């Protein structure tokens, strides 16, 4: 890997089997890509997440651990840098940037599965982060400093019409194989991450980012801030991972329990913590893993860092 301050050819960091690319990476792209990877790493490093992989537990997962996530996060980092650079170089309409970043991300999805020996740790996170990287890169053409609302507006513009194009039943019925998200859309009409992105990530914009800012203003630690933000997301997100594992009734119950935790003061007082333990045990006992909310937590942390640039508490 080259020093961050250098301008390098994409060919130096692209997977061997990827197509030849003709642009170079500048220092701003390294910086933004690093912040996106940091969001992924901080999400998985957060302890006591219900049903999710974290430092002291594999949650409801038997095929992955913290180590698996460390491997996949490092493997996909170059894609985040290159997607940022693609945004910085983009001159056309914003919807035309989407196939560019997806084309960059596709070979890294294969690299991810190769590195984890077939375990899907961050396929969805890569999809979201690649789009966020392209959006951040596009905004950084004018200035490295931009408002978080601008970031979500560009994401919405990039992904306009993605649900109609990719989740239309007439389109899905012609495909030989469907992803879990596509199957759930046919069954329950839940648009998943595509719906979130097309609407400018409303769960992140309207709930998670304010929750993270609130926790930081309160003086909470990083872990407490991230856990509070995750609970906030779980109270709002139609998490396809939960639906896939437990159906719509489980999703409804998880959202209700998460709202009760927040109502009692979240994890910032005894009543809220007691309610949180109940939520955590509910997820563990039923094998529920809110992976969609976890991916959005990573996006929230990255978006916060891209706009606020630093946390108010100690990094520990």
Curated annotation (Swiss-Prot):
<dbReference type="Pfam" id="PF01874">
    <property type="entry name" value="CitG"/>
</dbReference>
<comment type="similarity">
    <text>Belongs to the CitG/MdcB family.</text>
</comment>
<comment type="function">
    <text>Involved in the formation of 2-(5''-phosphoribosyl)-3'-dephosphocoenzyme-A, the prosthetic group of the acyl-carrier protein of the malonate decarboxylase.</text>
</comment>
<dbReference type="GO" id="GO:0051191">
    <property type="term" value="P:prosthetic group biosynthetic process"/>
</dbReference>
<keyword id="KW-0808">Transferase</keyword>
<keyword id="KW-0067">ATP-binding</keyword>
<protein>
    <recommendedName>
        <fullName>Probable 2-(5''-triphosphoribosyl)-3'-dephosphocoenzyme-A synthase</fullName>
        <ecNumber>2.4.2.52</ecNumber>
    </recommendedName>
</protein>
<dbReference type="GO" id="GO:0005524">
    <property type="term" value="F:ATP binding"/>
</dbReference>
<keyword id="KW-0547">Nucleotide-binding</keyword>
<dbReference type="GO" id="GO:0046917">
    <property type="term" value="F:triphosphoribosyl-dephospho-CoA synthase activity"/>
</dbReference>
<dbReference type="InterPro" id="IPR002736">
    <property type="entry name" value="CitG"/>
</dbReference>
